[in-house]
Amino acid sequence: MFQKSIMIDIEDYASQAPQYYSENIPGLLEKTLVGQRPGNFLDCGCGDGSLLYGLKKKKCLENWKISAIDLSESRIRRIKLIDPNIHAMVDNVEVLHTVPDQSVDLLVSTQVIEHVDDKKTFQAISRVLKKDGRIYLSTVFKKWYGWYFYRNNGRWVLDPTHLREYYEENQLMGLIFSNGFQVLENRKSLFWFPVADFFVRWAGVANRNFYEKKIVSLLRRIQVPILGYYNWELVLKKL
């Protein structure tokens, strides 16, 4: 998920920031899949596979050929436990050397691009996506008053490993247009933090399926807003 130049051990991060599985998937992504003919699907920076797990559980990827890449070897091993038919590879999203040119019909990248060199990443994505292919992209958008309790380079940040948090649309739109993409959807929604997540992570729960327990699922509905921080979702088409 991260470029190697970041001063963090990728496997340490994978163990310290586990992703838990549930059937929750972004509504905009589900809408995009409904309108797309099945083909080659790539989860770009897949992490532990929480998104792929939800998509598989809801049968959103039937008849799709599924691939996934992440920089962490341990996370790629977990992907193969979700479904051994997923073509899961250790790769850098800034390069995508394991992905052939113009081979992907739908590429998904959720909360990844803020961790990496966005210019290199968009160039790599543009190379592997087919003409008329789609991208579902989500990232962090921060208002001037946004605050969270992590700090990086003297600033309050949502995640201390973020290289950047976008605060103007043109910071990303310039890359989108210069790499030959059209914007089909552009949405922002306030981030809400499930209170239960804090206790789950604090307790170091190892079971990735922990969120599927009914009581935990109900408790996760208790959420607090993260003021000034938005989930920025984009659906793009390669021209």
Region annotations inferred by a language model:
Residues 1-100, 106-108, 122, 229-232:
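Conserved N-terminal segment of class I S-adenosyl-L-methionine
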Residues 5, 12-23, 50, 117-124, ...:
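S-adenosyl-L-methionine-dependent methyltransferase catalytic module, highlighting the catalytic core
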Residues 64, 86, 133, 181-182:
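A structural micro-motif
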Residues 74, 96, 115, 142-145:
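Active-site loop signature of alpha/beta-hydrolase-fold enzymes
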Residues 108-117:
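A short SAM/SAH-binding and catalytic strip from SAM-dependent methyltransferases
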Residues 238-239:
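Short loop segments at secondary-structure junctions
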